[in-house]
């Protein structure tokens, strides 16, 4: 049992012990959250280490398997994989521990709320005794003053009337003083009783909290200890495996797996050369009865190149240039003495003679030399041109042997290359834009001097189709990520094709395709402050700030089924400071802290403040508001940095926080969509139904600048639409633009877009359409902003929401 430390040590003259103990209890929630964050960070580190070890184990299997050391890599791989698994097991245990800490944190919040209600009486007693103490002190001072005044009048010989009047006041002050003394006694007794009970309650809560936290830490240390024991076992196993992998065993494995045989070469003795038998043995090998002369010659050439026998090498006769020749007498004797000779063998023997006669005239001027010089031989060898043997290779081998330079050259004498080039150029460049923009194609990057640019290719082949079309035809939902965002600013370069979306030119003036572009678009609006001139700000003025709340709604509609609608709504808050405020901040070492409150946050799933500039109280219990305060030192440094980058700016924007709004499917979309396609070989009918949905907004607001773009393929030759649309033949897209939609619109904001397309290369394939709109003056979540405290005033607050990726499919 722990001693009653809280009961004995939290009294004091100002009776502020209750406040200290209550805030200490609230700090327990912060400790629990920070412990969960610490364990989560440790789990992240362990997971990253496990992945790195797994990658290392895989790389070990890719190392060289040659040599006697190769089997050792298997030992490394096995050990590394086991280490990775150990750390992965620790990650699982830490994740379970995080869930336990989070569950305890939720229970802790509920317990603290209940305790707050229970100690409400003590809080009243504290406030009562504090107020009575102050009143008692004042009544005592008044009583002393009246008594002194009465005695002074008596001593100075004042009139009886003045003395009586002073006596009445003194008696009244005495009664008041006695009354507060009695009240203080009662309040003191009540305060001591309740404070004793409350202090003990707070101590019990802290004891329970610390015991639970220590149990969690014990579980953490045990998990780490178990994993370290497993890691130790893995290391022991690795040491044993390496001890068993001896040098002898490695050499033995290599000898058994890579050995070439155990038979040693036999003994060879010197044998005398029998010239007669050697010459006789040549003819039977050459002679083939009923054989064709050409075939026999090829076989004889192959034999002379691939396996020259020792007998032929022993012929000593050479000509004047050093070439070996056969004696004519031997050849004649062979013809006469052997019945194998025939017209076939004669033709075979005559062909080498012809080659000998043709070789000699190659050096007519150098007949007096006995041997060609080394330089002349090099020149002769260098001038030899091999016959075109590429025709014998398969097409795959030919392409593999060709260099990148050969692929890019255009030679009239190389028909195969020209054919290959024409085949490549004839391909439909479905993925051309992505390759050109990324510049990551292997053929493009392999040669920096490639003469054929994407623009020249485009002059040969038909215009490229949109890069999104192949993706959408194979799978609608997977194609969302592939379709280019039609409302974002076009990013063009010298080598990339023109933008695929027809809205790309119009959107530079109204870029609202993402939350980032919304923030950029808001910058001029937020900068227009109604506050004082930036240069006239003084240290004593209330400093003006402006705020922009911007939300982006992303949606994907699948046909007319509302259950398949996917919605995500995000928002961000930007704060704008006048440039003159920087001088105020830098001249004042302790500027007033800027505190603000975000209201109506019940519909928010997550709030992410700028961790470098903004602080918040995680123990705040109000579910509809949240208070924040800014790190003024960090804000000053950040504003000074912005000022150095752009000294001429009148205002500087700071990203304060981002948030995500909870969504309820199609009910959270301000404009519901449904698309219908009817495709035939000659025509395509399209209908897009839209409906204004005020329930998605806290306060119904007007949707303005509505733009709809639909890609249509199949070779559109004519378009009929209602309301009128614009057809971009180059981009193959239809484009509608509506001024505004609201509850006051026709049919309550419901309507249809219809179009009929005549085709020359039908049928068309249904594609994904994109929609853009915006609304000024309100947000979907209803989030609001207000300043808390003094020193600052809100000069302007700007609210808007707009579309991010707002897509519809059939």
UniProtKB/Swiss-Prot annotation:
Residue list for modification Phosphoserine: 312, 387, 394, 403, 488, 493, 496, 508, 510-511, 533
Membrane topology: Peripheral membrane protein
Record domain F-BAR: where: 3-250
Pfam families: GMIP-like_FCH, muHD
Occurrences of domain MHD (ranges): 542-809
Location (main, coarse): membrane
Skewed-composition ranges (Low complexity): 433-456, 502-521
CDD domains documented for this protein: F-BAR_FCHO2, FCHo2_MHD
Entry keywords, A to Z: Coated pit, Coiled coil, Disulfide bond, Endocytosis, Isopeptide bond, Membrane, Phosphoprotein, Ubl conjugation
GO annotation terms (biological process): clathrin coat assembly; clathrin-dependent endocytosis; membrane invagination; protein localization to plasma membrane; synaptic vesicle endocytosis
Localization (cell): Membrane, Clathrin-coated pit
Location of region: Mediates interaction with DAB2, EPS15, EPS15R and ITSN1: 521-810
Gene Ontology cellular-component annotations: clathrin-coated pit; clathrin-coated vesicle; cytoplasm; cytosol; plasma membrane; presynapse
Record PTM: Ubiquitinated. Mainly undergoes monoubiquitination but also polyubiquitination.
InterPro entries found in the cross-reference section: AH/BAR_dom_sf, F_BAR, FCH_dom, FCHo2_F-BAR, GMIP/FCHO2-like_FCH, MHD, Muniscin_C
A GO molecular function held by the record: phosphatidylinositol-4,5-bisphosphate binding
Position(s), cross-link Glycyl lysine isopeptide (Lys-Gly) (interchain with G-Cter in SUMO2): 297
Keyword Hydrolase: no
Remarks, miscellaneous: Deforms liposomes into a range of tubule diameters from 20 to 130 nm in vitro.
Function: Functions in an early step of clathrin-mediated endocytosis. Has both a membrane binding/bending activity and the ability to recruit proteins essential to the formation of functional clathrin-coated pits. Has a lipid-binding activity with a preference for membranes enriched in phosphatidylserine and phosphoinositides (Pi(4,5) biphosphate) like the plasma membrane. Its membrane-bending activity might be important for the subsequent action of clathrin and adaptors in the formation of clathrin-coated vesicles.
Similarity field: Belongs to the FCHO family.
Quaternary structure note: Homodimer; disulfide-linked. May form homotetramer. Interacts with AP2A1. Interacts with EPS15, EPS15R, ITSN1 and ITSN2; recruit those scaffolding proteins which in turn may interact with the adaptor protein complex AP-2 at the plasma membrane. Interacts with DAB2 (via DPF motifs); mediates LDL receptor/LDLR endocytosis.
UniProt name for this protein: F-BAR domain only protein 2
Organism of provenance: Homo sapiens (Human)
């Amino acid at each position: 049992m722990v001693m009653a430390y809280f009961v004995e040590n939290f009294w004091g003259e100002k009776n502020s012990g209750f406040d200290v103990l209550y805030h200490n209890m609230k700090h327990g929630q912060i400790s629990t959250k920070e412990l969960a964050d610490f364990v989560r960070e440790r789990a992240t580190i362990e997971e990253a280490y496990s992945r790195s070890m797994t990658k290392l184990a895989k790389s070990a299997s890719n190392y060289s398997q040659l040599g006697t050391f190769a089997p050792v890599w298997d030992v490394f791989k096995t050990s590394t994989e086991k280490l990775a698994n150990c750390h992965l097991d620790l990650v699982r245990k830490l994740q379970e521990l995080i869930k336990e800490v989070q569950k305890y944190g939720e229970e802790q919040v509920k317990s603290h709320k209940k305790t707050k209600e229970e100690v409400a009486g003590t809080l009243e007693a504290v406030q009562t005794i504090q107020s009575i103490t102050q009143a008692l002190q004042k009544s005592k001072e008044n009583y002393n003053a009246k008594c002194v005044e009465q005695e002074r009048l008596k001593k100075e010989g004042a009139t009886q009337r003045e003395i009586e009047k002073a006596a009445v006041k003194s008696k009244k002050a005495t009664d008041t003083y006695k009354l507060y003394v009695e009240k203080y006694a009662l309040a003191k007794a009540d305060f001591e009783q309740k404070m004793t009970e409350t202090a003990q309650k707070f101590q019990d809560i802290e004891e329970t909290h610390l015991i639970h936290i220590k149990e969690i830490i014990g579980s953490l240390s045990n998990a780490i200890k178990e994993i370290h024991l497993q890691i130790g076992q893995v290391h022991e196993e690795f040491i044993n495996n390496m001890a068993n992998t001896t040098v002898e065993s490695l050499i033995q494995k290599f000898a058994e797996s890579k050995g070439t045989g155990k038979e040693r070469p036999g003994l060879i003795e010197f044998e005398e050369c029998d010239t007669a038998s050697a010459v006789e043995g040549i003819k039977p090998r050459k002679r083939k009865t009923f054989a064709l002369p050409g075939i026999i010659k090829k076989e004889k050439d192959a034999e002379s190149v691939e396996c020259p026998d020792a007998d032929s090498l022993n012929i000593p006769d050479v000509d004047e240039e050093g070439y070996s020749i056969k004696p004519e007498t031997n050849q004649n004797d062979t013809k006469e003495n052997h019945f194998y000779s025939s017209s076939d063998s004669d033709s075979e023997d005559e062909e080498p003679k012809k080659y000998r006669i043709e070789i000699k005239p190659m050096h007519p001027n150098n007949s007096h030399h006995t041997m060609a010089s080394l330089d002349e031989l090099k020149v002769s060898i260098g001038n030899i041109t091999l016959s075109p043997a590429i025709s014998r290779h398969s097409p795959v081998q030919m392409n593999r042997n060709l260099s990148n330079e050969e692929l890019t050259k255009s030679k009239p004498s190389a028909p195969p290359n020209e054919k290959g080039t024409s085949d490549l150029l004839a391909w439909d460049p479905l993925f051309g834009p992505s390759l050109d923009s990324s510049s990551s194609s292997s053929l493009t990057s392999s040669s920096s001097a490639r003469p054929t640019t994407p623009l020249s290719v485009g002059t040969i082949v038909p215009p490229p189709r949109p890069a999104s079309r192949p993706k959408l035809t194979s799978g609608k939902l997977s194609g969302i990520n592939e379709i280019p965002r039609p409302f974002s600013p076009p990013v063009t370069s010298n080598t990339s094709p023109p933008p695929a979306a027809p809205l790309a030119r119009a959107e530079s003036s109204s870029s609202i395709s993402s939350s980032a572009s919304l923030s950029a678009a808001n910058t001029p609006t937020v900068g227009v402050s109604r506050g004082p001139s930036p240069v006239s700000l003084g240290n004593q003025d209330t400093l003006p700030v402006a705020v922009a709340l911007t939300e982006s709604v992303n949606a994907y509609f699948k046909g007319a089924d509302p259950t398949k609608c996917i919605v995500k709504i995000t928002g961000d808050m930007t704060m704008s400071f006048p440039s003159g405020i920087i001088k105020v901040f830098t001249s004042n070492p302790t500027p007033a802290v800027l505190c603000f409150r975000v209201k109506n946050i019940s519909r928010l799933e997550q709030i992410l403040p700028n961790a470098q500039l903004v602080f918040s109280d995680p123990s705040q219990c109000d579910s509809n508001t949240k208070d924040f305060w800014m790190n003024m030192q960090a804000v000053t440094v950040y504003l000074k940095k912005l000022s150095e980058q752009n000294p001429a700016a009148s205002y500087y924007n700071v990203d304060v926080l981002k948030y995500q709004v909870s969504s309820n499917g199609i009910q959270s979309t301000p404009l519901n969509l449904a698309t219908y396609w009817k495709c035939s070989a000659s025509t395509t009918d399209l209908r897009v139904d839209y409906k204004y949905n005020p329930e998605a907004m806290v306060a119904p607001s007007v949707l303005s600048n509505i733009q709809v773009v639909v890609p249509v393929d199949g070779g559109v030759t004519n378009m009929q639409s209602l309301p009128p649309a614009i057809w971009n033949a180059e981009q193959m897209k239809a484009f509608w633009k509506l001024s505004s939609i609201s509850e006051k619109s026709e049919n309550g904001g419901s309507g249809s877009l219809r179009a009929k397309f005549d085709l020359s290369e039908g049928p068309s394939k249904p594609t994904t359409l994109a929609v853009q709109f915006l609304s000024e003056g309100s947000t979907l979540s209803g989030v609001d902003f207000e300043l808390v405290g003094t020193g600052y005033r809100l000069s302007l607050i700007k609210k808007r929401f707009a579309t991010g990726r707002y897509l519809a499919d059939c």
